[in-house]
């Protein structure tokens, strides 16, 4: 069965202080915009959630712990404000319920026993960014 990413929700994560929903509706997207507009935060949020199944719980929790130097919380959020990354995947052409995943200061649903969806999806997941494109162009032009 084919699944598509319907939306990413970020709250108190990097650039996004207020709850932010980015609806992809299963489409391919190209993110562009001014510096400091949150593009990297969206990509980093998706990457962090997708890779979380590989990490111990403590390694995931540090991203939401305001006392940890490696936290990814919005710098203007208070210590008590909820911080999270959520995704919803929808099945293509089937009457099956969507799959929702969250990593946050209170919940890590990507490590649920018996649910291999994130692990299997990550195996086919590749982040393509400007560094990869730049390296590819450099290698091609250096020949």
Question: In which residue ranges do the predicted regions lie?
Answer:
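N-terminal nucleotide-handling cores and adjacent loading/scaffold lobes of large enzymes
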Residues: 1-143
């Amino acid at each position: 069965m084919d699944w598509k990413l319907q939306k990413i929700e970020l709250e108190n994560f990097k650039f996004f202080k207020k709850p932010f929903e980015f609806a992809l509706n299963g489409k391919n997207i190209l993110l562009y915009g001014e510096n400091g507009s949150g593009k990297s935060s969206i990509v980093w949020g998706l990457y962090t959630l997708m890779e979380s199944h590989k990490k111990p719980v403590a390694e995931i929790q540090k991203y939401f712990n305001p006392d940890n130097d490696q936290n990814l919380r919005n710098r203007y959020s208070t210590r008590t404000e909820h911080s999270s990354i959520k995704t919803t995947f929808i099945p293509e052409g089937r009457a099956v319920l969507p799959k929702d995943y969250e990593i946050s200061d209170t919940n890590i649903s990507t490590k649920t026993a018996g649910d291999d969806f994130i692990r299997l999806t990550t195996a086919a997941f590749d982040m393509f960014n400007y560094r990869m494109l730049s390296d590819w162009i450099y290698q091609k032009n250096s020949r």
